[in-house]
Amino acid sequence: SAGMIIMLIPTVMAFHLTTRNGEPHMIVSRQEKGKSLLFKTEDGVNMCTLMAMDLGELCEDTITYKCPLLRQNEPEDIDCWCNSTSTWVTYGTCTTTGEHRREKRSVALVPHVGMGLETRTETWMSSEGAWKHAQRIEIWILRHPGFTIMAAILAYTIGTTHFQRALIFILLTAVAPSMTMRCIGISNRDFVEGVSGGSWVDIVLEHGSCVTTMAKNKPTLDFELIKTEAKQPATLRKYCIEAKLTNTTTESRCPTQGEPSLNEEQDKRFVCKHSMVDRGWGNGCGLFGKGGIVTCAMFTCKKNMEGKVVQPENLEYTIVVTPHSGEEHAVGNDTGKHGKEIKVTPQSSITEAELTGYGTVTMECSPRTGLDFNEMVLLQMENKAWLVHRQWFLDLPLPWLPGADTQGSNWIQKETLVTFKNPHAKKQDVVVLGSQEGAMHTALTGATEIQMSSGNLLFTGHLKCRLRMDKLQLKGMSYSMCTGKFKVVKEIAETQHGTIVIRVQYEGDGSPCKIPFEIMDLEKRHVLGRLITVNPIVTEKDSPVNIEAEPPFGDSYIIIGVEPGQLKLNWFKKGSSIGQMFETTMRGAKRMAILGDTAWDFGSLGGVFTSIGKALHQVFGAIYGAAFSGVSWTMKILIGVIITWIGMNSRSTSLSVSLVLVGIVTLYLGVMVQADSGC
C-alpha cells in the first residue's frame, strides 16, 4: 500500500516520486543518467541504479518498466535495479529538439502496376505527359518562327551565361503551346458528319479530345468534355501512413508466476505484444527459465490517406459547345458569348443549350465513364488522388479504420507500423516506422492519377451523347454574297487534323454578307474538299473572320470572293488519300465500338433501319468518299446496282455474299451521302 513508503525527500533526489499499484514509481529526467537514485522507505533507504542508454528528455514518448530487487547478484540483461525494494521507473526518450525515435524503413507494399485498370489517361510517374508537351513545343516552334526568334532574343538578352540563356529559351517555348484555341489546338480531334436528312447524330466525348459535328444546313459545332467531377464520394477505408508511439509500458513475471498483464491491453488505442524472455538470479527471479513479458504503447496516427467509393449517380459532366461562327477567338473560349457550358448528370441526362443566333441543340447523354466502379477505389493522399484496384487497396498492409468510424483512434492492424524489438528481462523497446508516404508514391507507379478541384475529384472516361439538331439553323442563310474585296489577315495555317485555317478581312460594302469560298483543282474545273466552318459570314466591315476548311491531298486553289479582286491562294496538302481513308475508317469503327448498344434504336422498325444506316455511314463513309470522289451520285447508284447484280449471279457462295453486301452498302451510301461532299 501507499502507506508502506515513507516519501521523505533525500538530499540527492532530483526526480519525481509517486506510486503505481501500491509500489514506488520514479519519474526520471535526463540529468539523472548514470547517477544513484535514492529515496527512503519503511525498510530504509532504497538505492536504484539506472543505466538506460535511451534516457532522454521528458516528453509524451515515455518508457515505463519495473527495476527488480538485487542485493547480492550481478545484474544480467537489465539496465535498472534497486537494493531494497523493486521500483517502477518512467523516463522520456525525446531528443533536446523534441524529436521522437522512429524506425527508418518502409512497409513492403505491393506495386499497383499490372493490376488491370486500363484507362486512357496518363499514369502516375509515367513520362507520357512530358513527352506530349515536348511534341507540342516542337510543333509550336515550327509554326511560329517569329515568336521563336523573339523568345531567343529575350533569352539572349536576359541570360548572362549560355546555360541561363538555354534555360530561359526552353521555359519561354514550354509556356507558349498552352495558349491555343479549342478544337484546332487539340491533337485528338474527331469529325462526325451527319447523314443527309437526319435529325440526330451520335458522338463520343472523352477527355483530351474534341469532336466537330457537321450536317447539311446546320452549323458546325465543336464539343469538348472539359470536366467530370465526382461529388461527395463515400469513404470506404482510411489508412494510417505516419504514426507516433507514446506511453510505452512493460510488465514481466518470473518463471511459474503466470502471464503478466497491463490495464492498457483493454484500451483499443494501445498496441501490445506478449513474449517470453530468459529470467534468473541476475534480474530478480529465484528460478532460472522463461518468464512472460508484455509491452504496450499508445498508437496515435499523425497522417492518413482515404479510399473513396464513387457511385455513377454522383458524377457530373461539363461539356463546352462552341459554334464555328468565324468570329475572331470564337473557337476555344470556354465561357462568354461564344461557348456554351452544359452540365450533364444521371438525374438530368437530357439538356438543351441555347446558342445565340444558331438556335437550340439538344443533347441526350448516357453518363458512362467506361469504368467499373465496383472494381475501383479512389485513393486520396493529401492533395493527390489515384484510381486503384479495389482488392489491391483492401490488401494494403497498413493500420486502417472503417470509413464510418468518426473517432479516429481505434486503428485496426496497428502492428504493421510498429516494431517490437527483442525483449530484455524487464524492458522491451518499441519503435514506430517512419512516414510511408514515399513508399506509397513508389507503390502507386502505374496507377491512374486523378486531378482534384475544390475538393471534388476530376475523372476520366467518355460520354456517349445523341445530338438532336432539328432546332438548329444556320446563321446568315438569307444574306447575299459579298461582292467586295477580301484581304488576308493571317496566312493559311495547317492544323494537325489535315484542315487549314485562314483569317480574312472584308474591305467592301454590303455587310452582313456570305463569304464566297471554294477549293478547286489546278484546272479550276472541279470543286473539291469541304468547308468545316459552314456558311462563313461577315457581320461587319473590317472585322477579321476565321475560316476552317479541309482541302484535298495534293495541289489545289483556295478561292475567296468574286471577280474582280478575287483571292486565289495555292495550297499543297501532304499525305495519302488511301492512308487517310483507312485512318478515318478505324476512327469510325472505334466510335461504333464505344457507342455499343446505345447506337441502335430498337423502338421501331424504322428506328432499326435508321440505326443500321448511320452505322454504315460512320464506319464506311470515309472509304466510300475516297473511292468515289468526283463521281456523280447517279453513277454511284449504278455502280452499286451492278455490284449487287454480279453478286447475285455468282456461283461462289462466299463471293456472292461479299459482293451483295458491298453492293448494298454502296447503294445506301450513294443514296444517302450525295449531299455531304463538296463545299
UniProtKB/Swiss-Prot annotation:
Q: List the disulfide bonds.
A: C183-C210, C240-C301, C254-C285, C272-C296, C365-C465, C482-C513
Q: Which residues form the propeptide?
A: 1-14
Give the Gene Ontology MF terms in alphabetical order.
protein dimerization activity
Record site: Cleavage: A14, F15, R105, S106, T180, M181, A675, D676
Task: Give TM regions.
Answer: 2-22, 139-159, 166-180, 626-646, 653-673
InterPro entries according to UniProt: Env_glycoprot_M_flavivir, Env_glycoprot_M_sf_flavivir, Flav_gly_cen_dom_subdom1, Flavi_E_Ig-like, Flavi_E_Stem/Anchor_dom, Flavi_E_Stem/Anchor_dom_sf, Flavi_Glycoprot_E_cen/dimer, Flavi_propep
Family annotation (SUPFAM superfamilies): E set domains, Viral glycoprotein, central and dimerisation domains
Q: Which GO terms describe its cellular component?
A: extracellular region; host cell endoplasmic reticulum membrane; membrane; viral envelope; viral nucleocapsid; virion membrane
Q: Which segments sit on the Extracellular face?
A: 23-138, 181-625, 674-679
For the region Fusion peptide, what residue ranges are annotated?
278-291
Q: What residues bear carbohydrate chains?
A: N83, N247, N333
- Its domain of life reads Viruses
Q: Which Pfam families match?
A: Flavi_E_stem, Flavi_glycop_C, Flavi_glycoprot, Flavi_M, Flavi_propep
Q: Which residues lie on this side of the membrane: Cytoplasmic?
A: 160-165, 647-652
For the biological process aspect of GO, one term held by this record is: clathrin-dependent endocytosis of virus by host cell
UniProt comment concerning the protein's domains:
The transmembrane domains of the small envelope protein M and envelope protein E contain an endoplasmic reticulum retention signal.
Query: What protein am I looking at?
Result: Genome polyprotein
Q: Which organism is it from?
A: Dengue virus type 2 (strain Thailand/PUO-218/1980)
